[in-house]
Amino acid sequence: MPRRLILSATERDTLLALPESQDDLIRYYTFNDSDLSLIRQRRGDANRLGFAVQLCLLRYPGYALGTDSELPEPVILWVAKQVQAEPASWAKYGERDVTRREHAQELRTYLQLAPFGLSDLPALVRELTELAQQTDNGLLLAGQALESLRQKRPILPALSVIDRACSEAIARANRRVYRALVEPLTDSHRAKLDELLKLKAGSSITWLTWLRQAPLKPNSRHMLEHIERLKTFQLVDLPEGLGRHIHQNRLLKLAREGGQMTPKDLGKFEPQRRYATLAAVVLESTATVIDELVDLHDRILVKLFSGAKHKHQQQFQKQGKAMNDKVRLYSRIGQALLEAKESGSDPYAAIEAVIPWDEFTESVSEAELLARPEGFDHLHLVGENFATLRRYTPALLEVLEPRAAPAAQGVLAAVQTLREMNADNLRKVPADAPTAFIKPRWKPLVITPEGLDRKFYEICALSELKNALRSGDIWVKGSRQFRDFDDYLLPAEKFAALKREQALPLAINPNSDQYLEERLQLLDEQLATVTRLAKDNELPDAILTESGLKITPLDAAVPDRAQALIDQTSQLLPRIKITELLMDVDDWTGFSRHFTHLKDGAEAKDRTLLLSAILGDAINLGLTKMAESSPGLTYAKLSWLQAWHIRDETYSAALAELVNHQYRHAFAAHWGDGTTSSSDGQRFRAGGRGESTGHVNPKYGSEPGRLFYTHISDQYAPFSTRVVNVGVRDSTYVLDGLLYHESDLRIEEHYTDTAGFTDHVFALMHLLGFRFAPRIRDLGETKLYVPQGVQAYPTLRPLIGGTLNIKHVRAHWDDILRLASSIKQGTVTASLMLRKFGSYPRQNGLAVALRELGRIERTLFILDWLQSVELRRRVHAGLNKGEARNSLARAVFFNRLGEIRDRSFEQQRYRASGLNLVTAAIVLWNTVYLERATQGLVEAGKPVDGELLQFLSPLGWEHINLTGDYVWRQSRRLEDGKFRPLRMPGKP
């Protein structure tokens, strides 16, 4: 059986692709004086040009010119220009094969190159094995191999040799990974791992299948079941630190492979691979279960507290009429008493003139019942659901292993007290139980004259545990999401080395004194400028008075002439089925090749099957209904393909392919240069089985839902999407989309609405090199912060909220740099850190320092906003693109009433990724045909004003059929370079 190739044909072409852009040609193919002197020794244009081209190829990519080599025209033109030869002479070069070979030999001597021999292969494999222990991506390994060989200056071998070296390196790395996971295991460990492949008692599924099931709902019953899963994993008792020295990418991939395989398939593996795979599954699944347990506990508490608050409000509303009646009655009585005092008459008679004395006495008793204590709130109602918590919290506290920072030691001590009480079946809280963690609003309920109230002591401790887990003051052993704060950051030694070498990956001056001096000087200048403009009433389209700030709304940005062009071009776009559109776009871009097999990296063999699975995600139809709507497909086929070919990383790579094509398309330049972007959240209601996984945000009503948070470039390409809880502020995820997309976009300026900004985001955006420009609602209520106090800027008094605490920034400067560097290098995601900062119940030093830094940037931005109408227009236009994209997404995601009905978070992510990929495909297809439509208008004698092209949008879908049977007609495929005919005006 022949060895499976690591590299696909497309990847081979990519690796040896020649530079074509002007920048790359200058970088790789610019001759020095010595080169030109050697080249000029050739006689005739053909020989000079051919010799020079061979010199270029031997330098980069590093291979010799073949007899059948086809070179891009830009290469020939660039080389010919430098050697002053006619480009047409290239066709004559090499008519004598001897000449070509003689030139190649002379150049090898000149460049001091040697051919790559078989004796060089072992060293290359050893070098690649180190990288293969981090990733088994063939393209990355081959790219590293070529780069390494270029530095050593041999002539590159055939790619089949590179492929062989990569394959051997992956095999060696796999054996090392297996060995690292299996050697520490005892016979007892292996026996327990084998047990996981057996049927669970009284069930038709194996232990491993049951253990990997996600909890269905946030309630005590499913919580207890999930706790049992964690206990089962803990019984396996893998050696401490197992897998710690294996790169997380490889460990996660091995665990995913094991998770997708049937127990029968796993049982067929040779022992070392089987035990290594099972160990990886147990390690990853244990961390997942711990994270899910903490999340479930959080959601149950949030649900109980929300229910108590709602009940409290309902009770208050019911009593509102009675309270109002009493207030009106006592107002009349009070007025009668005032009049009686003035007249000197009997006050008791005055009361009885308003209400009989017996009724007055009764009303006083009723008022006492209606009255509430001074600190009255909904907390006392939470106690009504104490039984719900008691069903699972003893077991939860038993299986979790929390650790605490000094600030949360009191909470940890309270948790330990609860564990001891549960173990000893104590009903009363010990008198010496820790109480320092109890907040003032809890004290009246917890600390009573009879002692510590058991019910409210436990609820308070569990609530504070939830808060401390969110902020990171408490972490859990074995968790991924709830780790020690310091573990998320770059190691202190590595950060110190980067700073010492001036290699921090940040966009600012790392010297705190110089940085702060520059920013504060700029802030002073901007404050002075805006003060002068405001005082002279010269702020553009804005007025600042003692009563506040007023900004004139922007006028319509689309002229009537542009609307006429929009209508004309939209009528010309060909009508097309969504299936044919996806096939067209895949023919242009090859995005489907990125959906590689999880195990061997092979491309999907059946393109229509793959596109059906993607479309099933995008239109919210699901695999079952998709199989019914697509002739020749079955659920089993689609399910298998999704399990092995569709993952977050394959969706991300395919999306990057589409975004890059949009970025490079000439017509897209009319909308922007790819350096600005916007982001916005789009809520989808959670229904059916997905309802229990949804979150509630009062902003969207009382129904649960999910938010798809999407970033879109100024060229309309949606380059990132995330599924997030509707209860989390949009600003948490703004940076993730900018930092972790895989496209070639280089975003410099980013726009959001009000929900997309916080001071922490302003700070991190600036540190990481992005200009942040949110459209802030009620801007006059968003305060400025100044260096010298409000008295220095009397004109701006209505806008000033306080003085900057620069001392705090200086004190935590290194912590700020370390945090930002960690986010930039991917050690931790920005969203995780921002969630933790948003959860701090106290004034954490780093959080406060970052906030102060953000206040500087926010103040500078607002001052810029007040001075620049152009900035306001730019932000407004960018956000409008995102809102228009949301309309397209809503139209595509039409099945199941547009509701999220998938129970697992993984499936919900696939829905969002599929939707984003298909909308990106629609954008690219529309861009191509909008260009053809404008060309068609010109050819028809209807000139198009180039200034109006910026107002066209590739987000229309009226011409796209999204419904019906999903038939993939290979016969409708267009030939290379061919396009569908435009519609004739006036025809459907």
Curated annotation (Swiss-Prot):
Chain spans, region Disordered: 678-697
Keywords: DNA recombination, DNA-binding, Transposable element, Transposition
Gene Ontology molecular function: any one: transposase activity
Disulfide bridge positions per record: none
Pfam families associated with the record: DDE_Tnp_Tn3, DUF4158
Entry's Gene Ontology BP terms: DNA transposition
UniProt function note: Required for transposition of transposon Tn1721.
Family the UniProt entry places it in: Belongs to the transposase 7 family.
Name of the molecule in the record: Transposase for transposon Tn1721
Source organism of this protein record: Escherichia coli
